[in-house]
Amino acid sequence: MKKLMILGGSRYAVPVIEAAHNLGLYVITCDYLPDNIAHKFSDEYCNVSIIDKEATYEAAKRLKIDGIVSFACDPGVATAAYIAEKMGLPFQCSYRATEILQDKGLFRHFLTENGFNCPHAKRYEDKKSPFNDIDYFNWPVIVKPTDSAGSKGVTRVDRVEDLADAINVALGGAHNGAFIIEDFLTFEGYHSSTDPFTVDGQLKFATYSDQLFDPEADNPYTPAYIIWPSTMKQEHQDYLTSEIQRLMTLLNMKTGIYNIETCVANGKPYIMEVSPRGGGCKIAELQRMAYGVDLIEAEVKKAVGMPIDEIKQTECDGCWCEMVVHARPGKSGILRSVTIDSDIKEKYLKVVDLSAKPGDFVQPFTGANMSLGDMFFRFDDRTELETVMSKSNEWLHIELDEK
């Protein structure tokens, strides 16, 4: 029986475990949090810090694994690439390419050096150095950890006097002690976050989405809704698909899933993030329902060297919306219940996956890690989607008790 090691134990790993079990694989989940939910579904738990490459590598050798993934688990991606390279296991790319993709500063430098559209950006480790580069940026700017996902540690800065605080916030969310400052891009339309797939370095499946933010949330840069298909102009989608393929070729990518974020600003399409892993927010699961393409199964098969079914580009069946369920702005307390009006539930709701349960303490929506779970909705067209989702405050009820 082949062994698949999954780095991370969040609920986003559960569909990967299910796919692996359906293929007859033995699943080992790894992190340093034994109570994480995914460990209840795996065949074996390995207690190791997944950002410690050498410790995780030693565990992988001892356990004689046949494949490794860090699905929807950003901190483990570089470790997964490192172990795959050391053990000769399949992975999307080399460890060096992964280092570039996983560090926002290195990635921005790579994009700029190779002629991709890219905002002014600089990577720093010293808190004081940015104050020598104030005129380099087109203000406002955005400050981020270089190695953190889920919008953690991200702050928009409009005034120089607020920069120091934003740097401290970014460093608080960083694992490697580095942060990036870049021009704040005002999107034309919406930001896109999707999970494409390559086979032998060729982009075989790619979608674009409309990622909507809750402007009233405690962190207004954390996605609250993701909608397929995108309203992005087709010419911009075609340009981005071509540029993503160029990026894949330059980095000598192989086979696997990616989480890719793109946008259009100043009349130009931008590749913002590329990570060799499945995305959080259950993106691949929604794409499976909307497009009929199972990239989770394909990624698992790839990881352990099994033949992959042909991956084909398909069209979206209707209009789909993923809602990231979160507390109302400024609200916190003990969760009593999450309910949906019956008419909405019966007509549009397809999936409910709540991570929070009654009795849990709910905090304001400051990052993806503060979500209460996800819901998938299907509509016949975009007008119907927007009409219903714009009234979610009326039909979605999140009841909290004071702490």
Region locations from a protein language model:
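ATP-dependent carboxylate/phosphate-activation module, predominantly the ATP-grasp catalytic core
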Residues: 161, 183-191, 195-253, 257, ...
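ATP-binding N-terminal substructure of ATP-dependent carboxylate-amine bond-forming enzymes
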Residues: 1-96, 128, 306-309, 315-318, ...
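A glycine-rich beta-turn/hairpin centered on an aromatic-Pro dipeptide
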Residues: 307-347
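Short beta-strand-to-loop capping motifs
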Residues: 158-159, 325-329, 375-381
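Short, well-ordered beta-strand elements within core beta-sheets of diverse protein domains
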Residues: 155, 183, 228-229, 288, ...
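A structural supersecondary motif
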Residues: 258, 342-360
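Active-site nucleotide/adenylate-binding loops and adjacent lid/helix of ATP-dependent enzymes
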Residues: 100-180, 200-202, 226-242, 246, ...
